[in-house]
């Protein structure tokens, strides 16, 4: 019996060593077995990272001189009733995503945003909007780290919980990511996520 325990310990330690080497070499980390309980913040943070990478790829792919690009009013049919003045430029959309990130993830509690969210909405240059967006993602990651099994479903506004607000924030990004992709393609740019 002692010998069996030693064998199990040696095999377990060897497996840990292999996992560590794979992690250091950039290999795919081991999959989490089905049924494993994962903290809500960690789970949502992984999803946020996926969309952050896609969005940051898109905003970095658009040249600075195209940040004022918006689709031409000519592409809209009169019967659609589109109010063209409400169509955002690429840069305005990037600033809007940053503002929304600060709003949605501030509802999780923890640190309040240390930026003027209204001022973020007025940014126009690529450099400024990308910097604001990068900051908003860093803030979102910090806020998600405060989400635990104990507080994940605490209400924050009416019937909205911390988790539903975080999920809404991520869903909001997905919506605008689709628009960013269309704007890139209208300018002959293949989105980085589509190049993989």
Q: What is each model feature region?
A:
Residues 19-23:
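Sec/Tat signal peptide C-region and signal peptidase I cleavage site
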Residues 25, 41, 45, 49, ...:
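Short, contiguous alpha-helical
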Residues 25-38:
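N-terminal pre-domain segments of enzymes
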Residues 50, 54-57, 61, 139-146, ...:
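Solvent-exposed, charged/polar functional surfaces in cytosolic regulatory/catalytic domains
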Residues 121-154, 164-176:
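Acidic/histidine-rich alpha-helical segments that form the ligand environment
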């Amino acid at each position: 019996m002692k010998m069996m325990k030693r064998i199990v310990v040696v095999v377990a330690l060897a497996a840990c060593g292999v996992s560590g080497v794979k992690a250091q070499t950039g290999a795919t980390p081991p999959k989490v077995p089905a049924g494993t309980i994962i903290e809500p913040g960690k789970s949502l943070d992984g999803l946020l990272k996926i969309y952050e990478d896609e969005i940051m790829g898109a905003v970095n792919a658009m040249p600075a001189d195209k940040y004022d690009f918006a689709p031409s009013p000519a592409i809209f049919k009169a019967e659609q009733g589109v109010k063209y003045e409400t169509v955002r430029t690429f840069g305005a959309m990037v600033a809007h995503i940053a503002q929304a990130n600060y709003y949605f993830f501030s509802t999780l509690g923890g640190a309040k945003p240390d930026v003027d969210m209204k001022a973020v909405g007025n940014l126009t240059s690529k450099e400024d909007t990308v910097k604001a967006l990068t900051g908003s993602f860093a803030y979102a990651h910090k806020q998600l780290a405060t989400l635990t099994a104990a507080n994940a479903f605490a209400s924050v506004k009416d019937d909205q919980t911390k988790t539903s607000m975080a999920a809404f924030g991520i869903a909001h990004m997905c919506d605008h990511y689709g628009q960013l992709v269309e704007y890139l393609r209208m300018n002959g740019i293949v989105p980085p996520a589509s190049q993989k």
